[in-house]
């Protein structure tokens, strides 16, 4: 498997020319890099005006590998070829490196780039990327991979230290300024022409620099809001190493790389809007920075959030008064680490009464709103304390816990809440303090512990009786001034005391069932399953030409092909009593087929959009301006890899995708709407683009002779 690395943007607060003077002192050898033994110049080129300098070196490295491995390989040193291209006019240095030794067995590529900071011309930016692909190595492939990754990661952050070392050396020698390159004197006519070109070039570059700085500043990534509140982003957005340290914490080079690569994937598949970096990092931590696993659970969570509109829960949902009066929980200052502190007096809470009065779904939604509020408070505390705070502390007081709390429907509701929170809010719990645990607690713990992740379980601290008042107790985690009064503290805690819910507020099972359906059917999205040979199709009837069909769908599982067809006659609706050729029901959603098998493309119906291939995890939005009235069919079809692809080596992502859809089943979540031409007050030309940015991963949809459209991926 190919190992990849991508660094964040590292900033030197020194001019580009001074950084280059420090960089050149690394050659022909560098005592600060023990493995870098020597280097020889293979070729060198300098342009007449001195603006371009290209030099190729052969570098000799002494890799710290087991003696047996070196003996089997038959080498003591490893050689790399490095090509440096310095453009003093543009103030850039591009470094390309690859291995010469064992190049037929191991493929190593590295690219580094020094550029001028887009917002401050006296600062310098550095980026680095690399890939490692071990084809074969005498049966020691895994060992060689570990050695290579160990050496590479240990030297990544050394690069900045080495540059800073030589900068200090230059300063000691009295060199604090290196003049910029200037072109040699030229004639008056050439000067005018050159000036004109420079002005034009600068005018073109300014917008790009501004776009890059939007990503570097991180301002839009750290604004208050929910965890997956959309953040506008472009492929040019890049993470600054200083921003990562300030807002996300200390990460290892490989952890930084995982964050950047997963973020880039989201930018490609959710073009324009991506989740916040803190949210992405939580899912990576939950899966030990395994990108594939983190991507899978994060895509599922993003789909879940979108389907149930969790992003807007704090603004659009008001908790019932029963919850405000009898749910004994609330936010209470922060712990010693700056984490928001949530206090829950579970022992004083009538779980049976709450379930009977509100139902399971209302309780779940209230817990979700608490988690959303916790994410907001984490962002606020990050700004207040000047350090990354990505989780909160929960204090649970169990005084009063008894067998009433083990009521079976109540425990069932608790287990469901735990399951949903674990899946969609990973790594948000920093510490759980369980106080005054009674004898009945082990019974409850036995029921719920199997549903709690091992990493989360390690954050639990359980105190029986008054043990929390002794050494290693509450004072180790919470300041004395904010210990709640009901725990013999001095701080008044504004948390409802709970108590029994009056039976007059209880509701019948039918009422609760209807309320539960109402809560979770407020979503405007529908789910559908797509099978191999059984696409899902929906029918839209258009009365007036120039209407606008809009769609928004997420590919939850597998890869699909999206098509739009037009027909002058209506297809036969599927029979409800027959599941044969027309419809299939499945737990994952409906499957409806409208196009009759006897229909012929071009005679009975026509294609008005080029087929669009959508990969798993993509979020797609688009629109189509209709040319004629009639019936339009939107189709999601199972995507089959072309047969010719079998002759080429498959990519890892394709292999994984083929394994995931081995059951020949895909799942989409979609929403469609028709806007009449008289109701659309925007510019019609904005919808009549001849090129569609539907997906960066597939060919652009173009306007056919029959239709005009505009599409885009968005999150």
Curated annotation (Swiss-Prot):
Domain PRELI/MSF1: 3-175
Residue positions where Phosphothreonine is found in the record: 234
Protein name: SEC14-like protein 1
Quaternary structure (record): Interacts with RIGI (via tandem CARD domain); the interaction is direct. Interacts (via GOLD domain) with SLC18A3; the interaction is direct. Interacts with SLC5A7 (via GOLD domain); the interaction is direct.
UniProt keyword annotations, A-Z: Cytoplasm, Golgi apparatus, Immunity, Innate immunity, Phosphoprotein, Signal transduction inhibitor
Purpose: May play a role in innate immunity by inhibiting the antiviral RIG-I signaling pathway. In this pathway, functions as a negative regulator of RIGI, the cytoplasmic sensor of viral nucleic acids. Prevents the interaction of RIGI with MAVS/IPS1, an important step in signal propagation. May also regulate the SLC18A3 and SLC5A7 cholinergic transporters.
Main localization category: cytoplasm
Domain GOLD, chain residue ranges per copy: 521-674
Compartments where located: Cytoplasm; Golgi apparatus
SMART domains according to UniProt: CRAL_TRIO_N (SM01100), SEC14 (SM00516)
MF terms (GO), sorted A to Z: protein sequestering activity; RIG-I binding
GO biological process: choline transport; innate immune response; negative regulation of RIG-I signaling pathway
Region named Required for interaction and inhibitory function toward RIGI: 1-510
Disulfide bridge map: none
InterPro entries: CRAL-TRIO_dom, CRAL-TRIO_dom_sf, CRAL/TRIO_N_dom, CRAL/TRIO_N_dom_sf, GOLD_dom, GOLD_dom_sf, PRELI/MSF1_dom, SEC14/CRAL-TRIO_domain
Keyword field contains DNA-binding: no
Keyword Cytoplasm: yes
Residues modified as Phosphoserine: 586
One GO term describing the cellular component: cytoplasm
Gene3D superfamilies, per database record: CRAL-TRIO lipid binding domain, GOLD domain
Residue ranges of domain CRAL-TRIO in the record: 319-495
């Amino acid at each position: 498997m190919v190992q990849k690395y991508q660094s964040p943007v590292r900033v030197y607060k020194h001019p580009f020319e001074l950084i280059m003077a420090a960089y050149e002192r690394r050659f022909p050898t560098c005592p600060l890099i023990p493995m870098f033994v020597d280097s020889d110049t293979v070729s060198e080129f300098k342009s007449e005006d001195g603006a371009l300098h290209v030099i190729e070196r052969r570098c000799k490295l002494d890799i710290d590998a087991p003696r047996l491995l070196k003996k089997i390989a038959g080498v003591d040193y490893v050689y790399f070829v490095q090509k440096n291209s310095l453009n003093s006019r543009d103030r850039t240095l591009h470094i390309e490196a690859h291995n010469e030794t064992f190049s037929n067995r191991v493929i190593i590529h590295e690219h580094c780039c020094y550029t001028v900071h887009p917002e401050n011309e006296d600062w310098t930016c550095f980026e680095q990327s690399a890939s490692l692909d071990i084809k074969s190595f005498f049966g020691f492939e895994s060992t060689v991979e570990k050695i290579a990754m160990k050496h590479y990661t240990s030297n990544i952050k050394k690069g900045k230290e080495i540059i800073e070392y030589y900068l200090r050396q230059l300063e000691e020698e009295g060199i604090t300024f290196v003049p910029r390159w200037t072109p040699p004197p030229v004639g008056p006519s050439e000067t005018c022409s050159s000036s004109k070109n420079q002005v034009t070039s600068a005018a073109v570059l300014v917008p790009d620099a501004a776009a890059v700085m939007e990503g570097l500043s991180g301002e839009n990534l750290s604004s208050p809001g929910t965890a997956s509140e959309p953040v506008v982003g472009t492929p040019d957005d890049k993470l600054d190493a200083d921003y990562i340290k300030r807002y996300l914490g200390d990460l290892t080079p490989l952890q930084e790389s995982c964050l950047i690569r997963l973020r880039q994937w989201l930018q490609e598949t959710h073009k324009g809007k991506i989740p916040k970096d803190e949210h992405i990092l939580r899912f990576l931590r939950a899966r030990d920075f395994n990108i594939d696993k983190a991507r899978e659970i994060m895509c599922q969570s993003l789909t879940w959030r979108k389907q149930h509109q969790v992003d807007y829960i704090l603004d659009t949902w008001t908790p019932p008064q029963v919850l405000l009066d009898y749910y004994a929980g609330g936010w209470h200052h922060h712990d010693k680490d700056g984490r928001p502190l949530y206090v829950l007096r579970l022992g004083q809470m009538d779980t049976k009464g709450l379930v009977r009065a509100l139902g399971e779904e209302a309780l779940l939604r209230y817990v979700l709103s608490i988690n959303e509020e916790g994410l907001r408070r984490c962002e606020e505390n990050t700004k207040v304390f000047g350090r990354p705070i990505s989780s909160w502390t929960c204090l649970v007081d169990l005084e009063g816990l008894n067998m009433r709390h083990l009521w079976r429907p109540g425990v069932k509701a608790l287990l469901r809440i735990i399951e949903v929170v674990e899946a969609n809010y990973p790594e948000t719990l920093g510490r759980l303090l369980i106080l005054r645990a009674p004898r009945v607690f082990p019974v409850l713990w036995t029921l719920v512990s199997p549903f709690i992740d091992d990493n989360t379980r390690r954050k639990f601290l359980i105190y029986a009786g008054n043990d929390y008042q002794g050494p290693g107790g509450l004072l180790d985690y919470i300041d004395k001034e904010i210990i709640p009064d009901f725990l013999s503290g001095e701080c008044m805690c504004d948390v409802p005391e709970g108590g029994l819910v009056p039976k007059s507020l209880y509701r019948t099972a039918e009422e609760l069932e209807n309320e539960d359906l109402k809560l979770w059917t407020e979503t405007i999205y529908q789910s559908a399953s797509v099978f191999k040979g059984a696409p899902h199709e929906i029918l839209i009837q258009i009365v007036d030409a120039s209407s606008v069909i809009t769609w928004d769908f997420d590919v939850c599982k597998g890869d699909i092909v999206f098509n739009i067809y037009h027909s002058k006659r209506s297809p036969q609706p599927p029979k409800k009593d027959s599941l044969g050729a027309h419809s299939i029901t499945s737990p994952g959603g409906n499957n409806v087929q409208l196009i009759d098998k006897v229909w012929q493309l071009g005679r009975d119906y026509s294609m008005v959009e080029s087929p669009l291939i959508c990969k798993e995890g993509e979020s797609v939005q688009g629109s189509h301006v209709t040319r004629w009235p009639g019936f339009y069919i939107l189709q999601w079809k199972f995507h089959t890899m072309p047969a010719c692809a079998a002759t080429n080596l498959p990519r890892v992502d394709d292999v994984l995708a083929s394994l995931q859809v081995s059951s020949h089943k895909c799942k989409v979540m979609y929403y469609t709407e028709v806007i009449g031409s008289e109701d659309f007050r925007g510019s019609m030309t904005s919808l009549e683009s001849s090129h569609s940015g539907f997906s960066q991963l597939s060919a652009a949809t173009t306007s056919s002779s029959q239709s005009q459209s505009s599409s885009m991926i968005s999150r």
